[in-house]
């Protein structure tokens, strides 16, 4: 079984960054994903301080890009240029603070066939590559599996994109996948099948990147994240499935409350594993 790094989505509130990361470490967390979903709250001046605090606490960072920063636009107009700029800026900040992955959403069908949408995403990621390489900040990106059954961003879509773009990895959101499968993620075999498909496209040594929480859904579409135990998604089969792979994993809780994040971590054994490694 590969090492599991586990932690919350979002930094805890604290007077200083050092205290925030110390609080994460005290709870046994060794990963954290913070977001620019509603705006860029971090600047280049503060990013090195964040990197130092995370490193001192042995917390691996990932970043969630703004929601509007998706690829696969129907044309290269204003919205595409804005998204490209936001992903570029996110990459600069991620590099400055030592984040290991930037998570982004895959976009929308916008009336196109799925194959054409995938082709547009891959093509526009080529534009992003050129821009980031020119600035020396081509960091790993992760494209997230989405939570609405008829929309773009199924696990199949994500795997095809990641297989064609070498700096992009799949991000498995098991809450989303549980919703779109009408609650099928109940046993280790189902989790392991998704992990095996992802393992086949990840480069050697790269960890699985996973989002996890309990989930409410209707008509195979996500409606909201739930406190752990209120829905039907459980961490035990994820733990057992991960044990079948040598590849390490980063698991981020997107639970709406701290107690749920702690409960999921206890099942995964993330806290005890971190202290014995």
Model-inferred region functions:
Residues 4-10, 32-34, 61-65, 102-104, ...:
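Hydrophobic faces of well-ordered beta-strands that scaffold small-molecule active sites
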Residues 258-274:
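C-terminal helical cap(s) of enzyme catalytic domains, especially alpha/beta-barrels
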Residues 9-13, 35-39, 66-70, 107-109, ...:
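Active-site beta-loop-alpha junctions enriched in small/polar residues
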Residues 1-89, 275-277:
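N-terminal pre-domain/capping segments
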Residues 129-222:
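Acidic/histidine-rich catalytic cores of soluble enzymes
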Residues 45-51, 80-87, 118-123, 155-159, ...:
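Charged helix-capping and loop-helix junction motifs
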Residues 21-28, 42-62, 88-98, 129-136, ...:
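Acidic (Asp/Glu)-rich catalytic clusters
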Residues 72-172:
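Active-site acidic/histidine proton-transfer and metal-coordination neighborhood
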